[in-house]
């Protein structure tokens, strides 16, 4: 064997197989430098030194081992006061920062560790082993810089860290590292989202599983090859050295040959050890691989059986419903007709069980075909040949010619598309629905920004509230406005489009109704939208809403997070409240129906007045009015002045509370009785437009929201092509366009992540994405970090200066 080939097998030359004893006593070197350049793997020299040390009775590492350990081991820099460094144990960064504790102690020095998308802190570095004082998940957190040294990390109210670094440079290093860690955490948390981050769940899971099995198989093959090569080269080395020893050489060379033979013996010992280790690992890996494959196949079979079982149950449920409707002689109640509370109460379950005839949502072996008769349908109602006199193209052309004054009163009817529902929904159970790509078949042709703007449909309630001199009466109208925002949801079972990052929507009704509104998608992970509306009638409404949703198999829960603010200019009364949970029932089988449940506390931060609204969840066993809402308006002392009663889909009434005197002259009960003569109707729902069931059950306002208007920002939802195509009935084209927009957004996100990573590596400042028309800062009333309108939008519109708008469509 040639000398170069021998070196390729053994290591980097004779030094790698030097005789033991050259090193002093000390621990054997298990790894390190000095690795070979051939098939022997990384560091035969180091391994030789290790085995030699063991064979020599615990002596120090051989020459190769010494060479590997000669350089000083790098030590992480210790963070000083307010400083930081790269920590070990997989941490991205760790060091001292000052954390705000309370007004007595102020800022206190704490040891912070940033690792795996989590920021944890301890009182000292020694505490890391046993006591963690707090941890915040960066995937759902927001990072805000206050000044040269201070910055804030908050996850929306539950946890907020006010931190201070020792210098501006240290602060920037921390913020950059945190932004990068957040980007990575978000990427891991949300591998797929509706706006197009990744592929569908089923395809992603399958690809990941195949890649894992392929990698394991490749590693097993590599180990098997390594095993064969080490045995082959070890035998060749021993044979070559034996031949060398048998040659007739001068006596002085015999000693060196003997020494080389000893070293070769050591290499053989090392090789045998490596061969044994490889063989053991190979056997173990093969054994576990078979177990994993068997377990995986079992789980696959179980999943298939469960899917088949659920499919059969869905069919049986559908047949039972058909049989029930065929057997009943009672007329079906239609919740679309406005009725009194008494009528609703009498209908009881009928509201939920019979309100939409022929509205099946079950899985069929191949496709689901929607029924013909009109009603509350999931994927659309049939279009008869005589229902429309003009084509979709002509309708679209007509809507482009509409002016602001002439609001449109119709949109193209919803087409009847077939959809294999179960193939999509079966992979969504337990998942965040906004992160799962869905076809437009599940959508309505409005974005979430436009749905948010629909809260202003009954803006006149705020106009009346602004004129109230009594703060308690004003609170009653604010409460009615809060309830009115849910009135359109009773029929709207389709989901809105998830806005793209930077997407906006304006609604200028200053001339007609005295208000104008602006929404912007300010965050993509988590998805969040900011909204600002102002009226010349004396009020301002603003909010930042994050929508989270979970599909539980039978129902879908939608949880809006965020605070809504309403400020009245004349009095300075500032009201805040949050939204309740929306639940969509019968996702897989049965008829879709929506319920609102939970409590809303409306607080007047100037006077201390409060209103507690209770949205009563629907129950099949309850005799109460469906969709019932009750409420009480109290002063700062807790005394009830008004009682509220109604339903969130019809109307709200107000009663002035008259206390009843007790035997001793005091109030016998705090609330007293609700005098019928004091009843005042605060709000009543407007009737739906004609043929609303064919137009996604849109209200009069909703029909106008996507109408084209000139002069809007290039990021306006009206200009979103997939949404426009869907509205005009071209769903196949809309799905293709949706994929294009998703890919474009995905590339933009990856570009920002690459820029953040490069900034971290270079140690340069990195400015994360910021909203264009809203600024993230602490709310002066709630102390929450939220996006507040910064201004300039309407000025830019007047000048038609949209140079700062991103290209998102």
From Swiss-Prot:
Gene3D superfamilies: 2.40.160.120, Pleckstrin-homology domain (PH domain)/Phosphotyrosine-binding domain (PTB) (2.30.29.30). Keywords: Acetylation, Coiled coil, Cytoplasm, Endoplasmic reticulum, Golgi apparatus, Lipid transport, Lipid-binding, Membrane, Phosphoprotein, Transport. A motif (FFAT) lies at residues 360-366. 25-hydroxycholesterol binds at residue 316. Cholesterol binds at residue 316. 20-hydroxycholesterol binds at residue 316. One of its GO terms (cellular component) is perinuclear region of cytoplasm. InterPro entries: OSBP_sf, Oxysterol-bd, Oxysterol-bd_CS, PH-like_dom_sf, PH_domain. Residues 293-328, 732-762 form a coiled coil. GO terms for molecular function: cholesterol binding; phosphatidylinositol-4-phosphate binding; sterol transfer activity. It is found in: Cytoplasm, Cytosol; Cytoplasm, Perinuclear region; Golgi apparatus membrane; Endoplasmic reticulum membrane. Residues 17-49, 63-91, 332-355, 729-761 are annotated as: Disordered. The N-terminus is blocked. 7beta-hydroxycholesterol binds at residue 316. Residues 20-46, 79-90 have a biased composition (Gly residues). The keyword Repeat does not apply. Residues 90-183 form the PH domain. It holds the Pfam family PH. It is a peripheral membrane protein. GO terms for biological process: intracellular cholesterol transport; sterol transport. A 1,2-diacyl-sn-glycero-3-phospho-(1D-myo-inositol 4-phosphate) binds at residues 119-124, 495-498, 524-525. Belongs to the OSBP family. The PH and the Ala/Gly-rich domains control cholesterol binding without affecting 25-hydroxycholesterol binding. The second coiled-coil domain is required for interaction with the tyrosine phosphatase. Lipid transporter involved in lipid countertransport between the Golgi complex and membranes of the endoplasmic reticulum: specifically exchanges sterol with phosphatidylinositol 4-phosphate (PI4P), delivering sterol to the Golgi in exchange for PI4P, which is degraded by the SAC1/SACM1L phosphatase in the endoplasmic reticulum. Binds cholesterol and a range of oxysterols including 25-hydroxycholesterol. Cholesterol binding promotes the formation of a complex with PP2A and a tyrosine phosphatase which dephosphorylates ERK1/2, whereas 25-hydroxycholesterol causes its disassembly. This is Oxysterol-binding protein 1. It comes from Oryctolagus cuniculus. The gene is OSBP.
